[in-house]
Amino acid sequence: MQKNAKHGKVVIPSDASPWPHEKRVARILALAGHYVEFIPETTIKTPDIYLERTVYEIKSPTSNKLDAVERNLTRALEKCPNVIFDSSRMKVRDNQIRKELVKRRKAGKGLKKLIFITKQDEIVDIEELV
């Protein structure tokens, strides 16, 4: 992923209520130099953030099973074709999750962009691994 500056920025509008795990993802992206803006809540399903003017849905499941990856990608695609998958709350090893994300990206299924945030706060662009 392309960096814009030494440190990016996180914008949280007054009518947005991000979850703590979503704020964590935004902070990691901003520290890598990206501009992140949370999207205000509405009554319809909307993505969570703008990342460099592109909408993304953040998924950070709490599970100890690898099948949570596919289930959460499917849920994310109901809102947006661009997904950020955060493994910090999963009890599955990052290398297993990464393999599953690459597999799902190769299968297509409506995904345009897929970013993986590891337990060590590493940002992995899955497109580069496909």
Pin down the residues of each PLM region.
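Short, solvent-exposed polar/charged micro-motifs at secondary-structure junctions
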Residues: T46-Y50, V124-E127
